[in-house]
């Protein structure tokens, strides 16, 4: 039997922040991997998040972010608020939002009417039931979005891949 005793452990903090409201959030559209701008409200939300972090007086060692503009812009607004440089951002496409496949760009309420509220909920929240794949010809497909040009083609999803 082993007993380990550690007298002093200084625990760190993990801060998780979702991006501020995007233009497509405002329009109630399935966004997923499409690169959309923050809305004015989203920019305010990011600055408020920065103020909260500033009040907590955390020293932050690493900043991780998805490839998505709305997330990067949210983080940059936070960093500006807490007076940190934005050259410390580590981007990883694996942190991107859920991919909504063929639902991308469609209105959520209209899809609830068409597919039923329960089915839309399943597509939005389940781990094992992805929406139909997005056509590779769609302008919303990640293969057709400049942001994702560096991701190996075989890793670019057509729909959610949790």
Regions found by a protein language model. Give the residues of each.
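Short, Lys/Arg-enriched N-terminal segments with co-localized hydrophobic residues
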Residues: 1-10
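Short non-domain terminal segments
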Residues: 1-2, 28, 56, 62
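Extreme N-terminal starter segment of soluble prokaryotic enzymes
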Residues: 11-15
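Active-site beta-alpha turn of Rossmann-fold NAD(P)-dependent dehydrogenases/reductases
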Residues: 18
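Glycine-rich N-terminal loop/short-helix segment of MobA-like nucleotidyltransferase
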Residues: 21-36
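Short, function-defining helix-loop hinge/capping sites that tune catalysis or transport
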Residues: 26-27, 40, 102-105
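Short catalytic helix/loop segments, enriched in acidic residues and glycine
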Residues: 32-48
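Phosphate-coordination/substrate-recognition cap region in phosphate-metabolizing enzymes
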Residues: 47-160
């Amino acid at each position: 039997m082993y007993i380990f005793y550690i007298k002093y452990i200084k625990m760190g903090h993990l801060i998780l922040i979702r991006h501020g409201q995007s233009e497509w959030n405002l329009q109630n559209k399935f966004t997923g991997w499409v690169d959309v701008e923050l809305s004015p409200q989203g920019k305010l939300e990011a600055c408020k998040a920065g103020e909260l972090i500033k009040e907590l007086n955390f020293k932050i060692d690493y900043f991780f972010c998805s490839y998505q503009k709305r997330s990067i812009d949210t983080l940059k607004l936070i960093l500006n608020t807490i007076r940190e440089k934005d050259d410390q951002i580590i981007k990883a496409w694996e942190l991107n939002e859920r991919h909504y496949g063929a639902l991308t760009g469609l209105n959520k309420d209209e899809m609830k009417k068409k597919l039923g509220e329960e089915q839309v909920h399943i597509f939005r929240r389940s781990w094992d039931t992805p929406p139909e794949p997005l056509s590779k010809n769609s302008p919303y497909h990640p293969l057709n979005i400049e942001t994702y040009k560096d991701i190996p083609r075989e890793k670019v999803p057509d729909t959610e891949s949790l």
